Amino acid sequence: MAKKIKKILAVTGIRSEYDILFPVIDSLRKHKSFQVQLVVCGAHLSDWHGDTLKDIESDKFDVVEKIDYLLMTNRKTQRAKGIGNLISSLTQTVDRIKPDFILYVGDREESIACSIVANYMNVLAVHIGGGDSVYGNADDPIRFACSELAHVHFTTSQQYADNLIKIGEEPRRVFFSGNPALKNIKDVPSISKKEISKKLDFNLNKYAVIIKHPLSSSKEESYYQMKTTLEAVGEFSKERNIEAVGIFPNTDPGSYDILRAIKEEESNSM
């Protein structure tokens, strides 16, 4: 009798988590025992965040659903309302696709939505990135909840695997796999500083990289925190004679305020 092919429904909502997910689903789709399908949602469908759906499509995955649930209101209500919309749409997709596993990463809206839908629809939930911790943000308890609701766990460090076992997860379901994104770093062709400098249009002999995301516990402070950060980096850069490059924030409430501070700094330096 032929062995049944297992359906894996992977869910991705932002480029940072797709970077972790990619090596896993890329390997799985090459295995004759698995059929890999993707749900693409969230920031991937946002022009403001680079419309990264096109990158996923260029990777030639079978995208079975695009869920545009992101509410860019810059208010505390946006993530909770967005999760509700995502759960509703994802439930319909799971009912249609009927996967054997739902595969997801981390601690964002997609993660908790996958955890809830998988459990209520009797589908095995496979979670990557549990056991980690972050302070001052909703992501920490959300990640913990995802771990409690997941059936199989892949952690990025042995310490995180131990953390899951300490909170009661069965050791036989917890696997220390390392961070899959390390494979991407290994596989990316090397590029010289000269080439990067030309692309970014500044000197990379001495440089600093700045990135700041808003905290859910201090959303109202986001603008002032970023202004203070930029002032400090500006002073430091002048003292040390280095260049600084900034990266835009994520989609969380407060991100518009951080972006406003960046745009103001950009205007002042022109």
Regions found by a protein language model. Name each.
Residues 35-79:
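Conserved nucleotide-sugar phosphate-binding/catalytic loop shared by glycosyltransferases and other
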Residues 191-270:
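Donor-nucleotide binding loops and adjacent catalytic segments primarily
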Residues 7-12, 18-29, 69-171:
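Active-site and donor-binding regions of nucleotide-sugar-utilizing enzymes
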Residues 13-14, 40-43, 130, 179, ...:
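Cofactor-binding loop segments of dinucleotide-utilizing enzymes, especially the Rossmann-like FAD-
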Residues 12, 45-47, 149-222:
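A nucleotide-sugar donor-handling region in carbohydrate enzymes
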Residues 31-37, 62, 239-244:
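A generic structural motif
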Residues 5-6, 206:
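Nucleotide donor/acceptor-binding cores
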Residues 37-42, 153, 243-250:
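Short internal beta-strands
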